[in-house]
């Protein structure tokens, strides 16, 4: 009889425990958010142009600053004509920060004879790197300069040299 009494007391106890587990569950509805911002765009507004020059006997460099200043080293003689730094109009989210990644060396080629020159030492305003610029009001102008390595007259005969380069602008 004691066994039956003990079992009859334990059964409701186990039933109560299983009910407690069911009653311990809870659900809640939560929210999730996302905000789509304006795409970051870049438009070239001025092409990088080292202008007209003569390499003379041993060549050297033509340096174009992001601000548009032009100087030469070595025996390179600068002559009059159009020259300018590159510029890009960047648009995107209001007051967002962005990064600038400049190319390493780029080769430009003579359209008549396939002779080449190298463009190196790229510079930008604002300076390249992470968090380089801020789109105050949703836009900014970035200026680019570089150094053109010029060989001798044999290495770089007369003609127009051209090429392309890639600059990456990205949100931080």
Which residue stretches match the model-derived regions?
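Bacterial N-terminal signal peptides
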Residues: 8-17
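Positively charged n-region of N-terminal signal peptides that target proteins for export
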Residues: 1-4
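Short beta-strand and strand-turn-strand segments in soluble, beta-rich domains
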Residues: 114-127
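Generic low-complexity segments that are intrinsically disordered, proline-rich and/or Lys/Arg-biased
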Residues: 13, 127-128
